[in-house]
Swiss-Prot record:
The keyword Transferase applies. It catalyses: CMP + ATP = CDP + ADP; dCMP + ATP = dCDP + ADP. It comes from Photobacterium profundum (strain SS9). This is Cytidylate kinase. Its main location: cytoplasm. GO terms for cellular component: cytosol. ATP binds at residues 12-20. SUPFAM superfamilies: P-loop containing nucleoside triphosphate hydrolases (SSF52540). Belongs to the cytidylate kinase family. Type 1 subfamily. One of its GO terms (molecular function) is ATP binding. CDD domains: CMPK. NCBIfam families: cmk.
């Protein structure tokens, strides 16, 4: 991991707006982008492409350590490039998700992916999106942000997204799913979801993405000025 490239971490629960904020910050700063939530799916896809044994840590660890992946912000989307190929669509397939769950359960694979994520820290800088970026992966990040929103607001945003795709969804079911995931993430024994002690906590419940980005960027500019 580069010791000179500055890192900005954005952690928080699902649906708080981390992905959009990170993409906008990376574009504004001209920095690299890491979507840590996609990294296990990327590894799963690489394993499927290479036809390797999904239960063999001896095979998966070197694959994880040398994972050739890039995250590129384009418009309002993040493109995921695996070994030179845009795999953004494939990442969303059910098979990829199921395989990701299997490989994520292997301790040595998790350790290899932790090191691989840290290797994203290259000049001019990195914006890292996740749940434990500021607490575990990049504890020395120059700026740490914890982006939150009420479960009800996050369920409402998700419902609007799905309805725009023409899907019929139930608000109560979405809210229950989000609350259950929050409970799992906040109470897990390894890297529970929580703000780093030195993180700026932003509650986006009653804020637009423009307001969130403006507040985050003002904080980042101040931190970068103090560091220079």
């Amino acid at each position: 991991m580069s010791t000179h490239a500055p890192v900005i971490t954005v952690d928080g629960p699902s649906g708080a707006g981390k992905g959009t904020l990170c993409m906008l910050l990376a574009e504004k700063l001209g920095w690299h982008l890491l979507d840590s939530g996609a990294i296990y799916r990327v590894l799963a896809l690489a394993a499927i492409h290479h036809g390797v044994d999904l239960e063999s840590e001896d095979v998966l660890v070197p694959l994880a350590a040398h994972l050739d992946v890039q995250f590129k912000a384009e418009g309002d989307l993040v493109k995921v490039i695996l070994e030179g190929e845009d795999v953004s669509g494939e990442l969303r397939k059910e098979e990829t998700g199921m395989t990701a769950s299997k490989v994520a359960a292997l301790p040595r694979v998790r350790e290899a992916l932790l090191r691989r994520q840290r290797a994203f820290s290259n000049a001019p800088g990195l914006v890292a999106d996740g749940r434990d970026m500021g607490t575990v992966v990049f504890p020395n990040a120059i700026v740490k942000i914890f982006l939150d929103a009420s479960a009800e607001e996050r369920a409402n945003r998700r419902m609007n997204q799905l309805q725009q795709k023409g899907l019929d969804v139930n608000f109560g079911s979405l809210l229950s799913e989000i609350q259950e995931r929050d409970d799992r993430d906040r109470n897990r024994s390894v890297a529970p979801l929580r703000p780093a002690e030195d993180a700026l906590v932003l509650d986006s419940t009653d804020m637009s993405i423009e307001q969130v980005t403006a507040q985050a960027f003002a904080y980042i500019e101040q931190a970068l000025e103090q560091k220079s």
